[in-house]
């Protein structure tokens, strides 16, 4: 029986399931129920997080997983429920080298991102900048990952603004599909710390032959660029190579 077409499922926010042949890789499992955590401090939007529940059918989406990637340890990427899920030890986990000790303290036996294949999938770690200047330094290291499957090269960029590290990853790996953490996350001080709607549109127009999938919106209080804001900007910029999935939506890479 031939393998199903490769696909990327947005669970919620930055939580993804990459369906690549026999592998099903979860990225950044944020699994807390709505309102379980306080709002991100220093944001103009005070609502508790997550802003929305997991989508209907989320439990089924998280069945049959073969591996996990944790791009960094901020709570909107690995929360208490997500850590408990990974600590069950049912699947291998890869994370940033800087995070391995903390993951171990949470009962998660992880290896460095890119140190080994994820099952049958080659994976390489990429860098990024979680903002600009001193604020990015304070927020700490972030990573992305490039996975290869058949003719697809999938770049999960992680929590980065457009930066030298991001542009280098596009140049070196020439991905066919890029997942961008959008939302224009921002605090009361400094510049946005994830991709803004304008950045997504500009990047897409700079790379017209690449498919971009924008996630990281409408679920966490400091992500102020909503899906509606992004879609309006993409229409204004005539950027037609960006998909903006809803929670629970599967994007087939054909």
Model-derived regions, located:
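Active-site neighborhood of phospho(di)ester-bond hydrolases with catalytic His/Asp-centered motifs
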Residues: 27-30, 64-76, 94-96, 155-160, ...
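Pre-active-site segment of Zn-dependent metallo-hydrolases
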Residues: 23-69, 80-84, 133-135, 162-172
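Catalytic core of the metallo-beta-lactamase
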Residues: 4, 10-23, 117-176, 195-198
């Amino acid at each position: 029986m031939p393998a199903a077409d490769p696909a990327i499922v947005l669970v919620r926010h930055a939580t993804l399931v990459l369906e690549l042949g026999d592998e099903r890789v979860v990225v950044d499992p944020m699994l807390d129920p709505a309102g379980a955590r306080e709002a991100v401090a220093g944001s103009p939007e005070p609502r508790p997080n997550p802003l929305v529940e997991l989508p209907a059918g989320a439990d089924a989406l998280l069945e049959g997983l073969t591996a996990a990637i944790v791009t960094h340890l901020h709570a909107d990427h690995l929360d208490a429920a997500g850590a408990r899920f990974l600590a069950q030890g049912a699947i291998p986990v890869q994370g940033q080298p800087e995070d391995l000790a903390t993951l171990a303290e949470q009962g998660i036996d992880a290896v460095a991102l890119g140190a080994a294949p994820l099952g049958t999938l080659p994976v390489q770690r990429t860098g990024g900048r979680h903002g600009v200047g001193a604020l990015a330094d304070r927020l700490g290291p972030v990573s992305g990952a490039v996975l290869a499957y058949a003719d697809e090269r999938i770049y999960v960029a992680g929590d980065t603004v457009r930066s030298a590290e991001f542009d280098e990853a596009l140049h070196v790996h020439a991905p066919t599909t890029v997942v961008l953490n959008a939302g224009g996350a921002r605090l009361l001080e400094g510049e946005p710390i994830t991709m803004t709607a304008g950045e997504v549109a500009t990047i897409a127009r700079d790379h017209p032959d690449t498919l971009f999938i924008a996630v990281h919106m409408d679920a966490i209080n400091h992500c102020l660029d909503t899906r509606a804001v992004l879609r309006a900007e993409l229409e204004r910029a005539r950027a037609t190579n960006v998909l903006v999935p809803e929670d629970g939506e599967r994007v087939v890479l054909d």
